[in-house]
C-alpha cells in the first residue's frame, strides 16, 4: 500500500528565533583551548538566550570596559556611535577587545591593572581629541595625523608589553581564558534558558563535546596558524584581537545540536481546548486521501521536475484528487533528473525479449494499475522498476533502479545490455548517508555491471568504455524505513581495462596486509597534477608536489571500512604529511633510517600499498612526467628515502635510478629554468 510521504517538520525550540532545518552531525571533539579541568566551574558575566548573540555581546562589553577608563563614558559612546569612519571604529573595537581580555588576565595583579587603566585613560582621551572624523588617526594613514598615530602605536605597544609580562610571554593564554571564562559559560546559560533547567557540574564539564568535530579541527588549525604567524612576524594588537574574535564564534559552531533531541524529550506543547459544540463525523478522524500518480515510462529522453509539481511531457503526475500542502510536503529541493538516462530497444533480440515501450502506473493506497500488465509488487511499481523485457536484464538494489546507456545507433550494430555482476548474490546497496542540505540520498556502494554485446541470437562479452549509470529517481514510498529524499547519484559501471580507469574494481587493495578491504577514490589525484608550464618554473618544488599527488591518490574511498580507513589515514598523514615543515623533518629523519626501525616498517607498509594501487600504471606515467619535465629524479641513487620508496612502489624494476627514459630535460646542456612572470609571459634566464 502506497502511503503519503511527508518530510518531518523542523524541530523548534521554545524561545528560539530560527528553525533548525538540517540534521546535526555527530558532535564529539575537544577544543584545544579547553582541557579536562578547564570547565569545572563555569560562571561568566555575559548571559543571553541565543548562541548567535554572543559575538555582539562581547564587543559591547569590551567597548564598555574601555570607555569606563575615560573621563566621560557617555561622550565616548556618542562619538563612537555617530562616527562614519568605519576603519577608525574597527581599530577601536580591536583595541577594546584586547584591553578587556588583558583586564581579566591581570585581575590578580593590582600593579598591572593600574598600568592598564592608565593606558585605557590615555587611549580614550585620544578618541575624544580625535573625534573619529573623516581624517582620523584611528583610520588609514594620513600625513596630517602621523603624530597622533605615533602616540596610538605607543599605547598599543604598552598594552602588549603589559600582557606579555603577566602571561609569561604566552599570549595564547588570553584566548584560553576567554573560552574558559566567557564562551563556555555563555553556552551553558543558553542551554539552561532554552530547556528551563539547571546543568550539573558534570554536564558543564562536558560542554566542549557539543562542538562539531570538523569545526573544532578548524579552530585548532587557525590556532596553529596564529601561533606560526606570531613566531614569524611578532605580535600586534590587530592580529591578537582578531584571534580573540574568532574564539567568540565558537557558540555558532554548535551546529543544530538541538536537532538531535528526541521529540518525546521536548516540552509538551500547549494544545488549545476544543471549542464547545457537536463534533462532526462522530469525532472520527477523516482518512487521508491517497495520491494518484500516473507515470508514463517511454524509451526516449524524459525528465521530471517536481520543484512545485510534477508535469512533464514524458512523466506526468496527476494531483487532481488531492492538493499537496508544501508546508508539510516540501519538494522544492527534490529534483528528478533523468536527462542523461536512455533506453534504446532498437537492437534488442525480439525473440528473447518482448515488452511494450511504455507503461502507465497508477499509485494509490490499495492498488497499482498498469496499461500493459499488472506489476507483481507495489514496491517495484513505486520505485519505477523496469521489467526485464524493456532493456535486457537489469538487476537493481532494494531501493534504487538504474537505467544504462544503450544507444547503439551511434556505436555499432550490436546493442549493449547492462547486467549486474551481483545478480545471484542477493546483495543490496544500503543508503549510507543522507545529506540534509541538498535532500539527496547517497548510495554507499556503486552498482557493479558488465556490458555484453547482443548479436542476433548469441550474446558475448566484450571490452567497452566506462558507462555512466544514473539510478532512476523514485518515490520510495510504501517501503519499510521509507527514504523521503530523492536519489540522484552517479554510479560508475566498470566495463573495461583502459589505462587510467578503474581495473575491474579495487579488489587488488585487499592484498595490502593490515589494510584489508582498503579502497581508493578513483582519479581524484588528477586535479593535483600541475601543468608542464608550471613544472618548468624555477620556483617549482617537484618533490613536494609529486608526493602531494601520491597523497591524494592514496585517499581512501568512503566504502572502506571505517577502522581500516582511520588507521590508513594515520599512516598516510605520518609518511606523506601535508605540511612542508613536517615533510622536511621526516626527510631528515629518514637520512639515517636504520636507527628508526618502526619508521622503516611503516615505509615498507606504505610501499606495499602503493604497489597494489589499482591505478599504479597511471601514477607511474605521472612520475615519468615529473622526472622528465621537473627533474624529479636528477639525484638518482642519492634520492631521499621517502621519495625512493614511493618510486620503487610505482616502478618495481628500479629503472628510474639510471634509465634514460627518466632523464630530465634539465640535465641537458644549454637548458635553463623558465621564469613565470606576473603578466603570464615566460622567458629564459
Curated annotation (Swiss-Prot):
It is found in: Secreted. Keywords: Actin-binding, Secreted, Virulence. Residues 265-386, 404-432, 494-514 are annotated as: Disordered. Residues 338-349, 369-383, 494-511 have a biased composition (Polar residues). It comes from the Bacteria. Residues 497-669 are annotated as: Actin-binding and polymerization. Residues 291-304, 417-429 have a biased composition (Low complexity). GO terms for cellular component: extracellular region. Signal peptide: none annotated. InterPro entries: SipA_actin-bd_C_sf (IPR023224), SipA_C (IPR054043), SipA_chaperone-bd (IPR023225), SipA_N (IPR015138). Pfam families: SipA (PF09052), SipA_2nd (PF22163). Residues 315-337 have a biased composition (Basic and acidic residues). GO terms for molecular function: actin binding. Actin-binding protein that interferes with host cell actin cytoskeleton. It stimulates actin polymerization and counteracts F-actin destabilizing proteins. Potentiates SipC activity; both are required for an efficient bacterial internalization. In vitro, forms a complex with host cell protein T-plastin increasing actin bundling. It inhibits ADF/cofilin-directed depolymerization both by preventing binding of ADF and cofilin and by displacing them from F-actin. Also protects F-actin from gelsolin-directed severing and reanneals gelsolin-severed F-actin fragments. Belongs to the SipA/IpaA family. This is Cell invasion protein SipA. It comes from Salmonella typhimurium (strain LT2 / SGSC1412 / ATCC 700720). The gene is sipA.
Amino acid at each position: 500500500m502506497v502511503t503519503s510521504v511527508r518530510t518531518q517538520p523542523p524541530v523548534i525550540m521554545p524561545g528560539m528565533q530560527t528553525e533548525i532545518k538540517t540534521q546535526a552531525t555527530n558532535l564529539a571533539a575537544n577544543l584545544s583551548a579547553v582541557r579536562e579541568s578547564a570547565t569545572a566551574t563555569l560562571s561568566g558575566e555575559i548571559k543571553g538566550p541565543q548562541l548567535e548573540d554572543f559575538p555582539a555581546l562581547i564587543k559591547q562589553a569590551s567597548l564598555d570596559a574601555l570607555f569606563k577608563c575615560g573621563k566621560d563614558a557617555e561622550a565616548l559612546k556618542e562619538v563612537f556611535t555617530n562616527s562614519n569612519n568605519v576603519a577608525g571604529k574597527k581599530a577601536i573595537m580591536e583595541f577594546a577587545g584586547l584591553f578587556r581580555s588583558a583586564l581579566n588576565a591581570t585581575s590578580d595583579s593590582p600593579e598591572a591593572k593600574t598600568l592598564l587603566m592608565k593606558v585605557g585613560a590615555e587611549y580614550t582621551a585620544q578618541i575624544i581629541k580625535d573625534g573619529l572624523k573623516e581624517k582620523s588617526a584611528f583610520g588609514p594613514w594620513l600625513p596630517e595625523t602621523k603624530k597622533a598615530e605615533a602616540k596610538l602605536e605607543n599605547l598599543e605597544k604598552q598594552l602588549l608589553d603589559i600582557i606579555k609580562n603577566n602571561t609569561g610571554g604566552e599570549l595564547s593564554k588570553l584566548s584560553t581564558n576567554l573560552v574558559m571564562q566567557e564562551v563556555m559559560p555563555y553556552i551553558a546559560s543558553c542551554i539552561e534558558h532554552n530547556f528551563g533547567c539547571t546543568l550539573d557540574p558534570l554536564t558543564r564539564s562536558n560542554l566542549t563535546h557539543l562542538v562539531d568535530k570538523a569545526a573544532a579541527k578548524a579552530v585548532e588549525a587557525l590556532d596553529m596558524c596564529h601561533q606560526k604567524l606570531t613566531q614569524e612576524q611578532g605580535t600586534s594588537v590587530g592580529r591578537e584581537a582578531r584571534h580573540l574574535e574568532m574564539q567568540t564564534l565558537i557558540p555558532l559552531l554548535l551546529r543544530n545540536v538541538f536537532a538531535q533531541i528526541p521529540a518525546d524529550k521536548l516540552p509538551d506543547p500547549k494544545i488549545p481546548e476544543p471549542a464547545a459544540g457537536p463534533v462532526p463525523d462522530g469525532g472520527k478522524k477523516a482518512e487521508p486521501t491517497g495520491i494518484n500518480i500516473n507515470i508514463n515510462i517511454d524509451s526516449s529522453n524524459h525528465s521530471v521536475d517536481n520543484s512545485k509539481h510534477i508535469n512533464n511531457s514524458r512523466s506526468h503526475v496527476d494531483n487532481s484528487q488531492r492538493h499537496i500542502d508544501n508546508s508539510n510536503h516540501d519538494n522544492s529541493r527534490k529534483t528528478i533528473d533523468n536527462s542523461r538516462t536512455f533506453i534504446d530497444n532498437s537492437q534488442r533480440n525480439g525473440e528473447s525479449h518482448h515488452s511494450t515501450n511504455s507503461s502507465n502506473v497508477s499509485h494509490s493506497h490499495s492498488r497499482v494499475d498498469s496499461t500493459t500488465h499488472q506489476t507483481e509488487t507495489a514496491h517495484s511499481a513505486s520505485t519505477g522498476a523496469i521489467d526485464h523485457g524493456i532493456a535486457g536484464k537489469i538487476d537493481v538494489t532494494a531501493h534504487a533502479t538504474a537505467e544504462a546507456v544503450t544507444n547503439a545507433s551511434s556505436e555499432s550494430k550490436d546493442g549493449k545490455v547492462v547486467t549486474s555482476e551481483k545478480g545471484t548474490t542477493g546483495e543490496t546497496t544500503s543508503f549510507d548517508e543522507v545529506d540534509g542540505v541538498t535532500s539527496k540520498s547517497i548510495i554507499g556502494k556503486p552498482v557493479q555491471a558488465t556490458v555484453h554485446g547482443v548479436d542476433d541470437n548469441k550474446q558475448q562479452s566484450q571490452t567497452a568504455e566506462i558507462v555512466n549509470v544514473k539510478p532512476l529517481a523514485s518515490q520510495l514510498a510504501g517501503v519499510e524505513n521509507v527514504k523521503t529524499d530523492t536519489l540522484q547519484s552517479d554510479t560508475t559501471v566498470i566495463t573495461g581495462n583502459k589505462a587510467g580507469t578503474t581495473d575491474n574494481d579495487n579488489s587488488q587493495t585487499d592484498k595490502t596486509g593490515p589494510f584489508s578491504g582498503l579502497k581508493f577514490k578513483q582519479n581524484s589525484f588528477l586535479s593535483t597534477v600541475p601543468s608542464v608550464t608550471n613544472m618548468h618554473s624555477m620556483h617549482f618544488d617537484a618533490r613536494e608536489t609529486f608526493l602531494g599527488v601520491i597523497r591524494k591518490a592514496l585517499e581512501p574511498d568512503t566504502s572502506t571500512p571505517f577502522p581500516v580507513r582511520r588507521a590508513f589515514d594515520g599512516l598516510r598523514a605520518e609518511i606523506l604529511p601535508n605540511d612542508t615543515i613536517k615533510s622536511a623533518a621526516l626527510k631528515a629523519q629518514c637520512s639515517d633510517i636504520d636507527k628508526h626501525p618502526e619508521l622503516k616498517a611503516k615505509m615498507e607498509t606504505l610501499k606495499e600499498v602503493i604497489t597494489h594501487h589499482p591505478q599504479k600504471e597511471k601514477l607511474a606515467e605521472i612520475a615519468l612526467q615529473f622526472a622528465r619535465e621537473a627533474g624529479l629524479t636528477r639525484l638518482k641513487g642519492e634520492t631521499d628515502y621517502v621519495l625512493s620508496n614511493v618510486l620503487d612502489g610505482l616502478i618495481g624494476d628500479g629503472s628510474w635510478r639510471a634509465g634514460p627514459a627518466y632523464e630530465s630535460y634539465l640535465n641537458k646542456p644549454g637548458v635553463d629554468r623558465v621564469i613565470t612572470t606576473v603578466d603570464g609571459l615566460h622567458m629564459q634566464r
